[in-house]
A protein has these predicted regions:
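Acidic/His- and Gly-rich active-site-bordering loop/insert found
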Residues: 32-154, 175-176, 180
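Acidic-glycine-rich active-site phosphate/pyrophosphate-binding loop
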Residues: 131-147, 214, 227-239, 359
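C-terminal segment of classical bacterial N-terminal signal peptides
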Residues: 9, 18-28
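Short pre-catalytic strand/loop immediately N-terminal to key active-site residues, enriched for Gly-Thr
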Residues: 148-158, 368-371, 406-407
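Metal-dependent amide/peptide-bond hydrolase catalytic core
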Residues: 30-36, 62, 79-85, 218-219, ...
């Protein structure tokens, strides 16, 4: 008998225990039908298997440029999803649809897609990412370990927990013999940390084909919540081409690229509109090769954040128009504007689903916050929402801390069962036409 089968069949003593819990617990005694107790038991049964999966995923290094690790981890994930009955395929990035940016590697990691077919009509998608920000070789500094109420490991919060959550939400549904959805799709990419250059097109396409999308980025340790909005992220790269000359003997023969770059940065320093959540900040610059040479080349980069997809057009047009006003007419100014990630915007659909999720969480006696304002970061949920009016909600993952830190990334163990319960119940209710 498998672990999942053992979790599904309870002894008479166990049944009596849960019946007693239903009577003595104010939440369950007042409102929860027996089906919810079965979901709670299924969530409890999946906690240890989830931690075992999490250990496997964490101990495989999957930096976005580490193709060896990504191949190994995606194969592991595919095998787990096949074992649960999914029709699994690998989706290799296509050059024709990839959005290459200044830091996009030549090779982009593949996606794992699994499809589960049910008896209903609703189409639901669960998404997460398996890549991390860490260079190869750093896992030895933070291997998977459990210490008290925390599980530590490289990439455990961002976003290995999300991958494990998706797997074990599906395992819960299988253990409960629940198949009332029409299609349940799992989509996990391996290039999120480099702005999803190869997977964004598939995420957007798939998002438009589903009635709801649950994204499994972690929530905060100090805030048990779901997110309805994330920031859009863009970058501006300015390149100035001038002409080199001796700085002492013949500076007038040169065209100082640094002067022109400085002029451009200064005339674009006040483009932020904080009341609209639009931010443009110059953060990186480089010019010159030697102290005694007029620089022929200079570059600068700016970080851009927006709250609405429509804001991209306006800020890009402003930057390009400003760049036409030059200090040195003989310099050549080149502007590159990269839309690295769209914003996820709060909509009536995701507000309604999040409100329904709050009622589900309350069945456990827990309060679920819903945040409709972005924190400054961006996620793949925005790509899934880009061409659809369906509900797309972020942060169905565990409570975690320390993403992008090499020595202190962890998840809170006491959130595993509650978050499994929440996600599984949301899938079940959507399948039955509730929450949308």
């Amino acid at each position: 008998m498998t672990t999942y089968q053992r979790s599904f069949f309870c002894t008479a003593a166990s049944a009596a225990l849960f019946a007693a819990m239903a009577i003595t617990s104010p939440v369950y005694a007042q409102s929860a039908p027996s089906a919810q107790l079965e979901v709670q038991k299924a969530a409890s049964a999946q906690k240890q298997p989830l931690l075992e999966s999490l250990k496997e995923f964490v101990n495989i290094e999957t930096g976005s440029r580490d193709m060896e690790g990504i191949l190994q981890a995606t194969e592991l994930l595919a095998n787990k999803l096949r074992a649960l009955g999914g029709q699994v395929q690998f989706i290799e990035p296509q050059e024709s649809t990839a959005y290459r940016m200044m830091d996009t590697p030549e090779k982009i990691g593949r996606m794992v897609k699994a499809t589960f077919t049910g008896t209903g009509t609703k189409r639901i998608m669960l998404i997460a990412h398996i890549d991390t920000v860490y260079p190869k070789g750093m896992a030895a500094k933070q291997p998977f370990r459990i210490d008290g109420d925390k599980a530590y490991g490289l990439g455990i919060s961002d976003d290995k927990q999300g991958v494990a959550m998706v797997v074990h939400v599906v395992a819960m549904l299988k253990a409960l013999n629940f198949n009332e959805f029409g299609t349940l799709t799992v989509l996990v990419n391996a290039d999120e940390e480099i702005s999803s250059p190869g997977s964004r097109a598939e995420l957007t396409k798939a998002g438009g084909e589903h009635d709801a999308v649950l994204s499994f980025e972690a929530t905060r340790t100090n805030s048990d919540k779901l997110s309805l909005a994330t920031s859009g992220i863009a970058s501006v790269e300015l390149k100035v081409e001038g002409r080199a000359s001796h700085a002492g003997a013949a500076p007038e023969r040169g065209v100082n690229a640094l002067y022109e770059l400085s002029h451009q940065i200064l005339q674009m320093r006040d483009l932020s509109q904080n009341d609209k959540g639009l931010k443009l900040n110059w953060t990186v610059s480089q010019a010159g090769t030697n102290r005694n040479v007029i620089p022929a080349y200079a570059t600068a980069q700016a970080d851009v954040r927006v709250l609405r997809v429509a804001d991209y057009d306006g800020i890009e047009a402003t930057v390009r128009e400003k760049a036409k006003t030059q200090l040195l007419p003989d310099a050549k100014v080149i502007v590159k504007f990269e839309r690295r990630r769209p914003p996820l915007e709060a909509t009536p659909a995701n507000r309604k689903l999040a409100a329904h999720a709050q009622t589900i969480y309350a069945e456990l006696g827990r309060k679920l916050e819903v945040d409709d304002q972005p924190e400054g970061g961006g996620t793949d949920a925005a790509f899934a929402a880009l061409k659809t009016q369906a509900a797309v909600v972020e942060r169905f993952g565990l409570q975690g801390f320390g993403g992008h830190t090499a020595d202190n990334e962890y998840i809170l163990l006491d959130t595993v069962e509650a978050r499994l319960y929440l996600a599984a119940r949301v899938v079940m209710d959507i399948s039955r036409g509730k929450g949308l």
